[in-house]
Amino acid sequence: MKKQIEVVGAIIFNDDKVLCAQRNENMSLPLMWEFPGGKIEKDESEIEALKREISEEMLCDLEVGDKVTSTSYEYHFGIVNLHTYKCKLKEKMPTLTEHKSIQWLDVKDLETLEWAPADIPAVKIIVDEV
């Protein structure tokens, strides 16, 4: 049986734009786009994990809003259960520490990127809300 990996993703809004993060060349799913986030640690809630991951990866703090969706996707390395939330930055803009690049895109343009498969359902939900 494949390993289940619980992860969170932040759909970070700034006015009418959404933060998109491109995975590094040496990460799994190299150069694909994703909503930033990461693995949920033992005894950690989804929201706690989201705040911690964004603080560690992007050196900024989040205001976490409504949950968008939970999706599962089976990769060769395991089954990723991704829980995405609408978020806003508290103050500081994100700093790249792990990702190759970031972009702020209009919601209508989100589908122009090559997204990691687990993120695609959340992308579609956000685009359909506009």
Predicted regions and their residues:
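Conserved hydrophobic "DFG−1" position in protein kinase catalytic cores
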Residues: 12-13, 20, 87, 104
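Generic C-terminal helix-cap and adjacent flexible tail
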Residues: 2-3, 127-130
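Hydrophobic packing within well-folded, soluble alpha/beta domains
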Residues: 50-54, 67, 102
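Conserved N-terminal beta-strand and adjoining loop/helix that marks the start
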Residues: 1-18, 39
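NUDIX/MutT-family hydrolases
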Residues: 86, 95-126
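Active-site-adjacent beta-strand/loop module that shapes the phosphate/pyrophosphate-binding cleft
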Residues: 61-63, 71-93, 103, 107
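Conserved Nudix-box catalytic region and its N-terminal flanking loop in Nudix hydrolases
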Residues: 17-56
